[in-house]
Structures are given as C-alpha cells and as structure tokens.
Amino acid sequence: MPAVFPELFGASCIHKRPEPIMKASDLPYPCSLVFNAGVIKYKGEYVMIFRNDYGTDKERFEKEGRDFTGTSIGIARSKNGVDGWRFDPLPIIDSNDPNKDPELRRYYDPRIIEIEGRLYLCLAMATQHGICGAIAELSEDLKSCRLISHSVPDNRNMVLFPEKIGGEFVRLERPMPVYSRGRDRFDIWLSRSPDLVYWGRNSFLLGVEDVPWANDKIGPTASPIKTEKGWLTLFHAVDRDDETRGKNGWEKKWTKRYTAGMMLLDLEDPSKIVSLYKEPLLVPDMPVETDEGFRENVIFPCAMLLEDSGEVKIYYGASDTCVCLATAQLGDLLALFE
C-alpha cells in the first residue's frame, strides 16, 4: 500500500450540513472540544450523548503545552436531531469525579443504542493499565448509568447491533494488537454474548488490507442499520504519513486522515460480509474538517439513524473538535454496492 494517498472523494449522494450542529461554546459547563457523539431517537425526541474534553484552549495548548485536565460524557436533546439542543446541566460521567474507581482514568467516545426497550452505552475506557471497551446500561430517565462489562486491554470502538441475532447480543470491536500486527494495523472483529457480560465466539471481520485507501488502522463507528440487503455498517479508516497535514490544527505533528467506509453484513450471520464498498463514503473536505480544530483531517462517525422517510442521518466528530451531520437516502447508499 502507498505510504501517502492522493486526494480522496466521498460519495456524491452524501450531503453535509456546512456548519457544525454542536460546538464547545454551546455547552453550559466547561468545554474545550465536543465531538464523537452517539445519537438515538427516544421517547419522541433525539438524544445525543457526547464526549467533552476540557481544561485548555488552542493558545495554551500550543504555547504552554497545557493538556486537557478532564473528559466528561454529556447529554443533550433535540426535537429534530439538528438544532435546538437542550443540555443537561451537568455531565453524566466525569473523569474528575472524586468518587470514581482509582483504576479508571476516563470514559470517552460514547455510542448509544436501544435494545428491547433498554438503553446501552458503548464506551472507550482508559484505565491505569490499558484501554478497554466497556458496555453500560443507561437509566430510562437518562440520569445514571451502571457498568455491565468491559474487555481486557487493549480494545476500543465497540458498537452493539440494535437487536439480538440468533438469540444473542452481537458487537463489533477493534482490538489493538501492537506486537503482532505492527504499528497501528488494527482490524475489526465480531463477538457474541448471551447477556452482555460474557463475550465469545470471536471472529475476524475486516482487515486494514481489505480497505484500499487505508494504510494504518480501521474500526467500527456506529451501530448498524437493518436493511433488506443486510446490515448497513459504517467503519472508520485511517491513512497516515502525509507530512503536509496538521499545520493549522492544535496538534502540529498530526499526519493522519480519518475517513469513513461502509459494508453490508449478512442479516442472519453478521460475521459474513455481503458486500464492501471499495471507495470512501465520507472524507474530510469542509474547512471545519480540514483547516481548523484540534486535529485536522478527521471525521469520526458514532451514530447512524434511519428515518421513516428513508433519510439516513450520520453524526460524526469533525477534527476532534465539534459535532457535524451528514445525510443520504438509504436507497442511494444501497445502490453504491451494485
């Protein structure tokens, strides 16, 4: 694979809103960056659960090397899933909570899904001894959550399918085998569980080498959507080593580019790929994604919703800085596999 890729283009059926739908200044509590947000439709409105890094700004980060002092998980609601977001007054999880387990450093990159009437979160979980993927249950009133299970290190980017398949919960995940794969060549795996606690029947699903525009790592993004042709599934893909990148962002040495691809998985056995779209679906191409923010050239979806109209909403973090929204018609997305 080439070390540096040429310019990439997203699918023409994708329509991006030109401005972020959520930014740091919108929050009612300290926030430097708000991004990587899970979204569901719940009790007649849209519920977003988002990552918030806080405690510094661009000037202090660049001049003083001051890193972020904390990460929290917050909740907001909207009638249309686009604007008018109403924020809970405080985060539901905060890394500076004095009562948290001392082994835990922080939770981040949340996804949210409803399965059989219960709300579940998938979270990245940084501990003193490695990074884990975690699953928690969120209360019906969205006020509290409890940890159900977490993986051993190192693992991340877990997403749950929105229903049981063959009587089992199913998740996608991205282990990080630094020694065996080399550098960041991390791939997507699938696991099953009877109860969200004990996970097994693990199977390899998609490798970096299967994605023509990736040379670094890939990983799950949002919970899949069930369609007549299979489970519509997004993934992120990373290419790196372009030294021209990162010059306008906070992190000047950032040379990676995050894009999104898609595949169809078998409805009855999602460990089988029905079809893989061989081009990027989403690429960073707007100024908010390429020329500003914490890390340039990053788009990172964490939610995908299918509306009754056939519109698919894709919520994604841009430049690790804000939340953006892209839309497409389901029929147009499925046609890309033909």
What are the functions of these language-model segments?
Residues 1-105, 113-159, 163-216, 225-294, ...:
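Beta-rich carbohydrate-recognition and catalytic domains
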Residues 108, 158, 222, 300-302:
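Structural signature of WD-repeat beta-propeller blades
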